[in-house]
Structure formats: structure tokens, C-alpha cells
Amino acid sequence: MSPLETNPLSPETAMREPAETSTTEEQASTPHAADEKKILSDLSAPSSTTATPADKEHRPKSSSSNNAVSVNEVDALIAHLPEDERQVLKTQLEEIKVNISFFGLWRYATKMDILIMVISTICAIAAGAALPLFTAPSTFQRIMLYQISYDEFYDELTKNVLYFVYLGIGEFVTVYVSTVGFIYTGEHATQKIREYYLESILRQNIGYFDKLGAGEVTTRITADTNLIQDGISEKVGLTLTALATFVTAFIIAYVKYWKLALICSSTIVALVLTMGGGSQFIIKYSKKSLDSYGAGGTVAEEVISSIRNATAFGTQDKLAKQYEVHLDEAEKWGTKNQIVMGFMIGAMFGLMYSNYGLGFWMGSRFLVDGAVDVGDILTVLMAILIGSFSLGNVSPNAQAFTNAVAAAAKIFGTIDRQSPLDPYSNEGKTLDHFEGHIELRNVKHIYPSRPEVTVMEDVSLSMPAGKTTALVGPSGSGKSTVVGLVERFYMPVRGTVLLDGHDIKDLNLRWLRQQISLVSQEPVLFGTTIYKNIRHGLIGTKYENESEDKVRELIENAAKMANAHDFITALPEGYETNVGQRGFLLSGGQKQRIAIARAVVSDPKILLLDEATSALDTKSEGVVQAALERAAEGRTTIVIAHRLSTIKTAHNIVVLVNGKIAEQGTHDELVDRGGAYRKLVEAQRINEQKEADALEDADAEDLTNADIAKIKTASSASSDLDGKPTTIDRTGTHKSVSSAILSKRPPETTPKYSLWTLLKFVASFNRPEIPYMLIGLVFSVLAGGGQPTQAVLYAKAISTLSLPESQYSKLRHDADFWSLMFFVVGIIQFITQSTNGAAFAVCSERLIRRARSTAFRTILRQDIAFFDKEENSTGALTSFLSTETKHLSGVSGVTLGTILMTSTTLGAAIIIALAIGWKLALVCISVVPVLLACGFYRFYMLAQFQSRSKLAYEGSANFACEATSSIRTVASLTRERDVWEIYHAQLDAQGRTSLISVLRSSLLYASSQALVFFCVALGFWYGGTLLGHHEYDIFRFFVCFSEILFGAQSAGTVFSFAPDMGKAKNAAAEFRRLFDRKPQIDNWSEEGEKLETVEGEIEFRNVHFRYPTRPEQPVLRGLDLTVKPGQYVALVGPSGCGKSTTIALLERFYDAIAGSILVDGKDISKLNINSYRSFLSLVSQEPTLYQGTIKENILLGIVEDDVPEEFLIKACKDANIYDFIMSLPEGFNTVVGSKGGMLSGGQKQRVAIARALLRDPKILLLDEATSALDSESEKVVQAALDAAARGRTTIAVAHRLSTIQKADVIYVFDQGKIVESGTHSELVQKKGRYYELVNLQSLGKGH
């Protein structure tokens, strides 16, 4: 049964009142874990969105990118509303807080899973218990003392050897079963969590998404579920095995001889105390280090998210210095942390060697007193050695468990949330027959994500069945809100929405949405074929289960109706063409027509068209418009339109202004009334006669997709679910200028680097630390000698204890000496381990700091096109700075030191063994490669498991993210079940393939564990034979045996660094790639002519431009424009027509594709970039302030640090903010908070203007500098801008025309060209495009 048919709310959660919601992380169990969680969540949080060129032109209605707001904040924001309205908003936002125990992670385990886990647990414990049973060497002593004959000895020996072989076989079986079992149940449980999570996400109301941000869902479904899987898979088995080893070893020791075991346990207490004390410091220091990195990360995030600002002002160096302050701080704490770690490891080795000394010394006393025999002493010592080693294997896994619990708390919180608008619910009635009459009664609406804005106030509106109602009005007047309320995406805070007189609240939500088809302004297609995309329109309708032929007929008819059939059949694969993720392989007009076909295919009763033709050019719009009019016949249709010509035939036209109805009637009635609507019509009518189709426009459809595929570099290659890349090759009839040039550009390639290149590259970061490196490496060699020395001492001690009773006085003397030697080795180990730890600590922390600071500076060096790419989003780059640099230290000194240490151990062990007894040494050496291979395979497999499961889930995660990021489309198509079933099928397929690889790789892992026993058996058998023939004494036997086996095992641990080294290699390649990338427009470049002065004459000559990330969309099409020195020039036009692009090209954020831009007659691409930009100042729509004081923020306007006070004051006075600053208690030293959050919009904007004026620019660029302000602040800021423009060449982009009436020249843009120019009064008299814009705006003001 799929989770869809069950309710994930268990009775006890359903009974509970939804808890007050907050997003604190109480679940993270230790302060350290909590801290890491915080950093992780900070990294994964979707970064604050800055306007990329793409969304500058289309800003979504609600872009609150902050993650789930806590309840107290929500309460504060809605406090001004009446109680019932508050309740409506709260239910749409409410979150549940869940507390989870570790066992709660198996919430969805089936009976089968539990059975497998029980078996795996038993096996894991058995596998752990086998290791200490290793300890049975008493036979040797009896033969040394000639107590038994050779034959008797040989029988005993064979028994012992067989005992090891059986243990090995047992180990193989138990390890195999427990590894496979835990990995399988871990994957299975996580798969269920993923399915329930997606199901729950698809259930949630749209308001919840507005607040959540798609990034959050992506993080949960990818990173967080991986953390859970990590915490409940093989690590559970490894931990149980280690604990079992520890317990068994100590039981054996105490059973054999409790007094000696008790004395040896005392050092374990010392060890625990040392570790505990040390870890307190480690937690403290790493918290401080993480805090500093966090603060640095915030700076990096602020700077990268406002990169245009930093680039325009040339303040990269200043900002990089601010970042480096935090890095230095982090380095200081990080170094302390690593040094403490080094001392802890040193203390651990020191105590362990002292423990051997103590054990032998006490053992010799007990032996002489006759209290115990030699065999028991050896057993106790071996057992304690093995037991204390295994305890070290538990701690690394503990972190994985706490992370898993913390990650699950958030995910289960969403799963348990009951959506107020649940599309899965069967509640509510369905109507057998309805006409389609829609009515809004006294509706008041507020978006949950923006509770401070009332979008609609007391609107009553009747939309008769079978008739077309059109909504017009300025943006933000509430047109799209009507659509959102009819679709029930939101609940109105007051009033009702009725369908045929039934309150839609009482109707079943899924049924309601199935009766309605929606075509929105920016149509969303899914990453599948055109056929399947149109077929999505049939989900839940009476045609859903028709025969395939009938469905195909319906789909083709719908495509013909939407004027899409012809272009679809012209594609090589026709209807089976894959459209790519979100349909990016098609042009805007093609996507729009497929969306229309999808909407009409099910013959819906109600059709909602939200600016359905806005993405089309004039030619295709006419055809589609005719199609829509045909489609609207006989249905209730609601049309939102900007172009009034498209709604002339509507039965009723409703003019909305500021959330209220201004006037309504038919086209003729409204024109006769002579109100606002008539002015609009006149303005538009005049224009439509004047408009001539632009060259690029007429053939926008024919811009070949082959060209697009060429420009789109590998970065956006979309692939189908089975992994085949999808592109459309189609030859076009005619290319525009810019696409012709773009198609000649070579595609970007990704360089590959050899391991040696990367090692040299990483080493270059550590060049100044070479003395520390040398100290570290020398002490690593010394530390590596500890193990071989210990083996000699061990063998000496054993042969001493084997002396017969007659030599007890010699025994006591020798035992004292060798015990003392153990103690000395312990002290030496403490010194060498601590010293190399400290030396490498300095190296690796400095490496991380240098890498971060260099990377940050290199990122700031890049051109703006680099930041427009999706893979270089603010979040991605900040996380690259924090995680990849950490990985880089995987090939720094510490790892090299460890490798050197273990190589020394192995080398010394082999030499000593060969010197003392070459026969046995050679036999033992023959198994070393096998042991090493086992060690290597073990870690290779673990690394494979992890990377495999990450990769496997990327495909399905992408699918889930595509669905959640276009949740409105999924909801309006009622595709929730369909999406869930595809996701479920993908996870199932992954589960099957991963099971096969788990079965294979666990086989290797289990073999590697069992081989250790077989190798021991071989050495034991051959050594025993030599002993029996009295060729070797017990000393030679034990030296060779323990040197090589222990040496090889410790050498095997080198491979535990393999995953780190793998990550480090990838990280180094990423860094190298970044450092090798030379931006086209290079901020560091000294080339080009440096300017002494600038007059300020500007000219654009036939400039063509497309954004590198959207090469299919021409933005400027042959722009010609001149500005005289000192002129105030305004650029106006509808959104997306290229105004802001003109400013970006002037700042040289991008280079034009064709044509040239001249300042004072010089081509700006030939000038020195920094010299040129120093004469410009930019004030943009969203003022950018950084953490710090007002003064620091203003000083960012210039490169120099020391500015005379009077310049600063003059800039502030000109910006109309000086008085305000002086009124603050701290004056210029007032802290502005993150992103300037402590100041209002108007205050921030004026600080930004002061910063721009401090440069004393010759050219001032204003990009909608007042559009984000309310009318009060707008006046003040506008006055400041007018003052600032005196005596300078000023170019202003404006949405509010009232702000530019005084301009010397106004250029009117449309579709990337200038259609009119002149002064305000000239243009108004022309009654052209400008006149229409003026009327549109006065409509908004007049009511």
C-alpha cells in the first residue's frame, strides 16, 4: 500500500495540538553538533536572492526567501489584524515541531526490516566477539619448558590453528550478514522517509511554499535524507561490532585473572579522563573556529550576493580584507583545536605503552608469587589491548548518529504537518452537474508570506457561466490574486468564493481543480516529451483512462487548436521530443502554446488565462489569440491581459486598481464612459498602428535550437531519466545578428589535471610552512618506529615470563627492565605524536586560510556572466568556500605524516623481523600484500557505498525538486499522485540496483575482515612448527609474528585516508579550475588605456546583446543611443525591454555581442577596466549595504582608505542623509546590521547615494533607484538624486514616470530597440508608446 492511501499522522500525533512552531535546533544533541548543524543549515539555506538579469525583469509576486519564519515573527507581523483573519493566515503557515529519538528514525520500518535488523544485530555482535577469542598462546610456553613431547605439541598447535580458521569463517559470515542487513534496512527506511516526505510536501498549501523556498525542499530531500541514511546504515553495524569486541575482551580478561585485569583497567580510566578533558577544549575551540568561519561565510554571502555592486565600485580588495579578518580568527582557534587533538593522540599512545609496562611488571610479580601462570597473563594483556583499540572505533560514528537525528526532526516535522488545503483529502462534496458560474463575495485577501500587505479589499465580482470576464489594471492590483483564489491556492481572510452558489470551501479540492484549466504567464513544462506534457492535462478527468488512440487524437486536436501542431511535427522526433528540464529547449512562444494545448485538451468547464500570450511575439500572438477565443466559447473564462486588443470581445471587462474594482463593463461601454480604460485603449491603439515588426522579432520562432544548443555549454545539458542527453537539432531559415555571432563561439571545456599537478598546486599554499612540515615529517618517522620497538619489547617480555622457576630472580630483574623500557617508549611516543600533531596543525590551518582567501579573491575577480550561471549561485559559491577548502586539507601535512608514519612502521617491522628470524619473517611477509589489500578494499568499499548512494539519489532528487519548484502547476493539474508514483518508481529502481552492488561489495569487505584470521593462522602454524623443532626460541617467534602482523594491520589504516584523499583531489581540481579561469572582463587586468579625465559623452552604436545564460532570448537588437556630456537621460519601457541591460553594459558587466559602446569617442572595451569604472557610479534598485558602520559603508565607494572628513560630509549632505546620521546616538559609527537591516529602505538608498557621490563620478547611473520605496521616502530620495545629477552625465532607468519628467531626453524602449525619444512634453503630444505608459500609471494613481 502506498503512503498515499495511508495517513502518515499516527493517532498520537493527530491527537496532539499542532505545537507552536519554531525552527530552533534543539535536537542537535551536543553543542558541537548543534553548531555544525547551524553552519550546515546556514550553507544550505537558499541564499538571499539578488536580481540576476533573468529575474530583474520578472520578479515573482512573493519572493520571501527566508526559511520558515518562526511563530513569534508570524505573530508580530499579523498582530494588527482581527483574530479570525489572523487564524486564517496562521493555519496556512503553521509548522509542527517534533522531537525524535534515535530509534524514531525507523518509524517506517516494515516487519521484514525489523527481522533483518535483529539478525544483523546478532551477527554484528558475534563478529565483534570473535576477535578477542584470539588469545590462546599457552601451548608455546609448555613446549619451551620441554614439558610435552613434540607430537603432543603438534596436536595442540593444529587445534589452535584450526580454531583460528573457524573463527575466520565465522567472522566472514557474520560480517557479511550484518553489513548487507544494515545497509539494506538503512536504504529501505530512508527510501520510505523520502517518499513520505515528498508526499507530504505535495499535500501542503501554496502559502507554505511561498515561505519555505524551493531550496529548502531540495536540501531536505538530498542532504538531510543522506544524513539520515548515513546514520542508520552500516555505521550501526560497525558500532555494535566495536562495542561487542570491547565487552568480550574485558570479560575474557576478568575471567582469566581479575586482579591483573583490574590493575590494567586503571589506565583505561586515565585514558577516558584525558580524552574527556581534551574533548572539552576541542568542543570549545572548534565552536569558536566555526563561529568565525560562520561570520566569514556571512560576509562572503553578502558580498557574492551583491557582486554587481562590489564590481561597480571596485571594492573587491576592501571586502576581501574584511573576509580575511574572520579567516585569521578562525585559523587561530582551528590551530589550537588541532594542537589539543595532537596532544590527546600522544597521550593515548603514551598511556597504552605504559599500560603494557604496568601489566608485565605486575604480571611478573603475580607469576613469581605463583598466583597465575604465563598463559593467563598473556591472554589478559592481549585482551585488554584489543578491547581498548576497539573503543576508538565508536566515537567517529557517534557524530553520524546525532546528525541523523537532527536532520530527521525537520523532515518529520513536515511529514506530520496537516495541510489546511489538502489535495489528497476526500473531504468535501463533488457536484454531478454544474454550470460554472463563479462569484467573489466581499473578498479580502492577504498573502501569508507578506502579511503586512492587503492585496484585495472587499471585492465582489460575478463571472457568469459560459462567458468571458477580463481583468485589467496596473501590476500589483490583484488580477492574479483572483486566479489564485478561484484555484484555491490560498484561503481568503474574509469573504467567500462561490461556484454555482456553493462555497468552494465545501467542495472537494481535487475535484474542484480538475474542473479548471490554468495557463499562466510563465508556463512550466516538465522534463519529459511534448506528448506527455500535454497528456498531463488529462489527469483526473473523464478522458484519463481512454484508449491510447483516443488520447493521441485528443492531444493532436488540442495542439492544433493551440497552433502548436505544425511546429511540433516539424521537430525530428515530433511529439516524442523531450523538452528538457522546465522546457528550456523550447522558445518562450513554443512553451506557451504547449501549455495552452495542455489546458484545453480536457475540455474544461472553466479556463483561467493569466497573461497567456504575453511571451509571444505579435505574429504568433494573433494566431494563439484566435485559438484561445475558440477555446473560450461556451466555457467560463477569466482572462488577465496587458494588451487590451486581446480582450475586446470579452463579455465583461473589470478594471482593478490597488485591490479594488475601479470600473467594469463591456469594451464599448467602458470606452463611452471615457474613464481610465478609454485612455488606455487610445494610447495602445495609436501604438499598434505605428509598430513595425522588428527584424529579430518576426523570426523569433526560427532562431534555431541548434544554435541554442551550441551556446548552452555543458552546464545546462539536460538528461532524460535514463541518462540520455536531450537536444533538439533543427535548422532555421534565418538567423538574427546576435545568434549568428554566438553560434560561432567555441563551447567551454572542462580541463583535467593529473594527480601530480594537483599535489604541487596544494603544496604551493603551504610553501611558507616548510620548516613546520619538516619537523612534522621527522617526528612522524620517529613515531612510526614505536610499533616495531614495541613488538621487540613485547617478545622480550614474553620470553622473560617464560623463564623456568629456577631463574625467577633473573625473571624479576629482566621484567623490571623491560617494563621500564615500555614506559620510556610511551614517553617518547607522547612527545613525537604531540609534536607532529602540533606542527601539522599549523600547516593545515594555514593552508585552509590561504586557500579560502585566495579562492574568495578569485571569485571576486570573475565577470558578472560567471555569477549568472546556475552552478555559481551565491549558495553554491559560499558552500564551495566552506566545504571544499576543508576537503583540501585531506592532502596536507597530516595525511602525509600518517602515511610516512605507517610506512616507517611497516619498513622497520620487516627489517627487524628479517634480522631476527628470516624463515618465519618471509612466510609472514608473504601475507602482507593480502592484509594491505584488505585494508585498502575495506575503505574503498565504504567510500564507494557513500558516493554510489549519493549519485543514485541525485536523479530522483532532481525530479522531486523540479516538481516542488513548480508546485503551482503540479497543483493546478492535480498531478500530485502522478509525481509521487514516478518518484516512487525511480526510488524502487535505485533500491534494486543498489542492492546488487551492496551484495557484491559487502562480499569483499567481509573477506577482508576474515583474511586477517587466516593470515594469523598461517603465521601461527609455521612459527609453531619452528618452535616445536627448537629452531626458534619464543623470543624470535614472537618478534617475527607480532612485528609483521601488527605492522601490516597498522599500515592498512593508511587507507582510511583514501576517502579524504579522494575528496581532496576533487577539491583541488575544483580550485585549480577556478584559479585557471580567466574572466573575459578581468578586474585584475592592467591592460587597456588609463583615462585621466572623462567628459561624459556616451554613444551606443548598433549594439546587440543576449545574456550568456539565456542565449535564446535577444535583449538588445541593434540599439543606437547618444548622450551628451552633462545631460540627464531617462530610459523607460515595459519590463524586459533592455533598460537595465543598457546600464549593465555601460558598467561593462558584460560585453556587447555586436556593435560598440563609446565614452568620449573611445570604445570602452579598449579602456583599462578599473580606470574606466572609477569615473562611474551606480545606484541600483536594491541598495546594497554590508555589515559594519554607516561610515564604513559610505567609504566603500572609493578605493582609498583615508578620505578627508569634509568630503564625507559633503557627500552625505548631497545625498540628503547627513542630518539623519547626526541624529543617531552613534552618528557615523552606527552599525547597519546584516544587509543594512537596521535602516529603512529610504535610509539605505540615501546611504547608497552618498557612497556613489563620494566617488565624484562623471557619469551617474540610476537603475530604478526609487522604485522600491514608499511615496514619502521616494520624495526625499528623489530630491537627493536630482541634486546629485547636477553637473554630471546621468542615465536613469525609471518605472515611475513622474520621477523623470524633468529629463533632457527620454528614450522609450520596446523589445530591445528605441521606439521613441524626446522630452516629456514632446512625447506626450506624439500620443505614442510613452503616452500609453503615462496613462497606465495615472490609472494606478487616479483611484
Curated annotation (Swiss-Prot):
Name of this chain's protein: ABC multidrug transporter atrD
One of the Pfam families matching this protein, by short name: ABC_membrane
Transmembrane segments: 114-134, 163-183, 235-255, 263-283, 339-359, 366-386, 773-793, 820-840, 887-907, 920-942, 1010-1030, 1037-1057
tRNA processing is among the record's keywords: no
Every ABC transmembrane type-1 domain range: 115-403, 774-1063
Function: Pleiotropic ABC efflux transporter involved in the protection of the cells against a wide range of toxic compounds. Confers resistance to the azole fenarimol via efflux transport. May also be involved in the secretion of penicillin.
Disrupted gene: phenotype observed: Leads to the cellular accumulation of fenarimol. Leads to increased susceptibility to cycloheximide, the cyclosporin derivative PSC 833, nigericin and valinomycin.
Binding site for ATP: 473-480, 1133-1140
Membrane association type: Multi-pass membrane protein
An example molecular function term from Gene Ontology annotations: ATP binding
Main location: membrane
InterPro entries for this protein: AAA+_ATPase, ABC1_TM_dom, ABC1_TM_sf, ABC_transporter-like_ATP-bd, ABC_transporter-like_CS, P-loop_NTPase, Type_1_exporter
Species of the source: Emericella nidulans (strain FGSC A4 / ATCC 38163 / CBS 112.46 / NRRL 194 / M139)
Activity control summary: Fenamirol efflux transporter activity is inhibited by the cyclosporin derivative PSC 833, nigericin, reserpine and valinomycin. The effect of reserpine is transiant, while that of the cyclosporin derivative PSC 833, nigericin and valinomycin is proportional to the time of exposure. Cyclohexinmide has inhibitory effect only when applied prior to addition of the fungicide.
Gene giving rise to this polypeptide: atrD
Family annotation (CDD domains): ABC_6TM_Pgp_ABCB1_D1_like, ABC_6TM_Pgp_ABCB1_D2_like, ABC_MTABC3_MDL1_MDL2
Stated family: Belongs to the ABC transporter superfamily. ABCB family. Multidrug resistance exporter (TC 3.A.1.201) subfamily.
Domain of life: Eukaryota
Skewed-composition ranges (Low complexity): 20-31
Biased composition (Polar residues): 1-10
Annotated region (Disordered), positions in chain: 1-67
Induction: Expression is strongly increased in the presence of cycloheximide, camptothecin, imazalil, itraconazole, hygromycin and 4-nitroquinoline oxide (4-NQO).
Domain ABC transporter: 438-683, 1098-1336
One cellular component term from this protein's GO annotations in UniProt: plasma membrane
Residues with attached carbohydrate: 99, 309, 545, 872, 1083
Compartment(s) where it occurs, according to its Swiss-Prot or TrEMBL record: Cell membrane
